[in-house]
Amino acid sequence: MAAGAGARPAPRWVKALGEPLSAAQLRRLEDHRYSAAGESLFEPPLQLFWTWLLQWIPLWIAPNTITLFGLAINLFTTLVLIFYCPTVTEEAPYWTYLLCALGLFIYQSLDAIDGKQARRTNSCSPLGELFDHGCDSLSTVFMAIGASIAVRLGTHPDWLFFCSFVGMFMFYCAHWQTYVSGVLRFGRVDVTEIQVALVIVFLLSTFGGAMMWDYTIPILEIKLKILPVLGVVGGLIFSCSNYFHVILHGGVGKNGSTIAGTSVLSPGLHIGLIIILAIMIYKKSATNVFEKHPCLYTLMFGCVFAKVAQKLVIAHMTKSELYLQDTVFIGPGLLFLDQYFNNFIDEYVVLWIAMVITSFDMMIYFSSLCLQISRHLHLSIFKTSYQQAPEQVHKHID
């Protein structure tokens, strides 16, 4: 059956999740084509490995299954590290860092071949693109936490905060410029290079111990752990200069607007609100909630970021306006109100409540979004069928 020929009736439990997209958005989604440009430094040699790896993947395994399996491994290995280092100041057993290096490498490899599997099985679709970016948004949060733990960055709370949120900001900006230009652009130094660098950091902590990052470099008189932080700062400047060059030079819409015909600056409100709330709550906390519970704090705001990033991706795919109002901000709002009323309830308790609210809100939204799209396009999320939608990919190398 052709995509868009009429959605299958939704089961009652699916209807309870809600349907995030309107009929008009679903119609525009049918016309969406994935468009990417650019090639990073490490991509050509790694393509050889990814192509070799693909031949071992059976045709009956769906691309989204590959993506989800990789994400699950990455999340599990990082959660093990968080268990041993909840304040990002502890030193975990050596094998946990090795596990994280392996988990991140597996995630990177599977994330790279899911699209190849989709083209191989003729199952490319907007659903696969959304699912891939949705998983990436969550993985971005966990990678930042894992890397911070590996170098014991909790001894420098301000740098820890910066490194915890800079990855979210850069991921959002990448899709912000896509929303403006209609093309996902990869720089010479991009996510692949970042992931390789993080694998190296995990391996160094495996064989040298996390305490090695406290070594003071002679002459410079700075700790070794500051070097990767400075690398992050350099990456931020380099990447964001490229992103904002695209954003500020006008979009493909009418009068230089976004692909949806809205202001090119409008998506900045969403990531700006997340970062402003995170900074305010961090700095105004009477109980030092971020310093004492940095992993939980980052995960809570990470869930907020993941949902907002997912909304930005689907706004691009459906050529729709991105609205600021969202229930996912209830979690940070509770922390903000608790501080306003002089911590009427213990901040740690409120942080856990916020974590539960934001994580469920994000997962329900993403699940309902995928289910609605799968019904409308007559696709299976975790099954491969040669009768699925035709390939919807356009890629050109600058």
Swiss-Prot record:
Its EC number is 2.7.8.2. Mg(2+) 2 binds at residues 111, 132, 136. One of its GO terms (biological process) is platelet activating factor biosynthetic process. The chain crosses the membrane at residues 63-83, 94-118, 126-150, 161-179, 191-207, 223-248, 266-281, 294-316, 330-339, 347-376. The modification N-acetylalanine is found at residue 2. One of its GO terms (molecular function) is diacylglycerol cholinephosphotransferase activity. CDP-choline binds at residues 64, 119. Residues 2-62, 119-125, 180-190, 249-265, 317-329, 377-398 are cytoplasmic. It is found in: Golgi apparatus membrane. Pathway: Phospholipid metabolism; phosphatidylcholine biosynthesis; phosphatidylcholine from phosphocholine: step 2/2. Residues 84-93, 151-160, 208-222, 282-293, 340-346 are lumenal. The keyword Transferase applies. Belongs to the CDP-alcohol phosphatidyltransferase class-I family. This is Cholinephosphotransferase 1.
